[in-house]
Amino acid sequence: MNRRELMVGAGALALAGCGPASPAGEGLPVAAAGDDVFSGARLMADVETYVGFGTHRTGSPGDLATSDWFANHWRELGYEIEQTEVEAPNADTTVARLTAGGAVFDGFAQPPLSFTPESGLAGKLVRWNPASPADVSGRIAYVYVAREPGAVSPGAAYRQAFQACAEAGAIGVVAAMSGPSGEVVAINTPVTMTLTIPVLQLGEKLKSQLDGIVDVGSDVTLTITGPGGARKGKNTIARYGAEGPWVIISTPQSGWFTCGGERGPGIAMSRALAVWAIKQDLPVRWLFVATSGHEWTDHGADLFHQNNAPEPAETALWWHLGASYGARAHDETPEGLVAKDTPNPVRALMATPDLVPLIEKAFSGQAVIETPMPADVSKALGEYRLVLEEGYPSGAGFWGGNAHFHTPIDGAENTTPAIMEPIMRAIADVIGAKLKAL
């Protein structure tokens, strides 16, 4: 029994009703005749608009603006629109700071949030050593996890260390986050997870200063305050067509910061594919979905799968536009990161057997993704994992990281028109070839 069958057996309920899908041919494309919706310039303009909405945490003003932007775009094309609620903890803070003498370090409070008194928690900053956990009892633990050059930030190891510090009796944690950029690197968090002590992230670029504070035994104050509570984002679903099997195009829209290279290419390509799709003479119905709640470990996607996704037997194809597959590469140098005009190599494309030869042809020459990984639920990452868990017979999905992944500096400049355009055209070529063979 697969995941979908388990959910059906448990009686998953829809979050919101949906009217009938618009018949094919209704509505007028937003793009004027002759416009190339797959041009790199057009894709880049959408990435810039998305980043311009600001921070994309679930239910934030930037996240809600993105949902409305998607809904308006798809509605103007003639799609039937449904929006469903995605409730998640409010991850914003009013203060996230460490002070030591006259030094002040503002950082990122790592969810799940645990707040300090408004006056902060005072104490000694003590290095976390797994071999002697009692060292941090009653103290503020200082956590650093090294990484190999070129590797992504070891988020899972940091998460384990935070939990271990809490179990050892630490009153709080300050983490110097190892990563390519030297900035804080937020970690995706299960929506039901709890942590009993406050955790402040600071960038690795501050590590030498933090080491000095620990070495001299200075008194420090850790302060994390905020509104707390929960807030609601939206999954936005667009349907088009009256009959035939479904083609599903999914992309996450939310994240900890502005998510330019992480989310931007998927956002832009989803919008472009929606214009292209309704111009095709194919015997299918189209469903596009932009999910909130992603940074809460795929929470919004999970709700969509439970309540709104068509059944696998009703679906001809599912293509997931995940993280960082259209981001740009960076070289790590002693002076810092140097942006390149080539695609980020830390990316993956996984596909079911029917799509592999089509992808190999369409993506030829595109490093890494020209050789798709065979579909394997035990190796799938990101929201494409849910697609495979539920047994959808035909599909493909991207995921990846990048040098600015989950950092406050992941802006629109973390991708380029020249990187995105060939990916966009290859995706459309594969989808078109698959559906014309139905």
Language-model-detected regions and their locations in the chain:
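Catalytic-core environment of secreted peptidases
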Residues: 40-62, 71-80, 140-148, 152-153, ...
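N-terminal capping segment at the start of a domain
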Residues: 29-61, 77, 84-86, 183-192, ...
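Metal-dependent peptidase/peptidase-like ectodomains
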Residues: 243, 291-396
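His/Asp/Glu-rich mid-to-C-terminal helical/loop segments that flank catalytic regions of hydrolases
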Residues: 286, 401-438
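N-terminal export signals
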Residues: 5-23
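Noncatalytic luminal/extracellular "stalk/propeptide" segments of secretory-pathway proteins
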Residues: 36-40, 45-140, 144-150
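Second-shell loop/turn segments in exported
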Residues: 31-37, 52-61, 147-156, 160-161, ...
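Soluble metallo-hydrolase cores and metallopeptidase-like ectodomains found primarily
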Residues: 107-133, 188-261, 272-279, 283-286
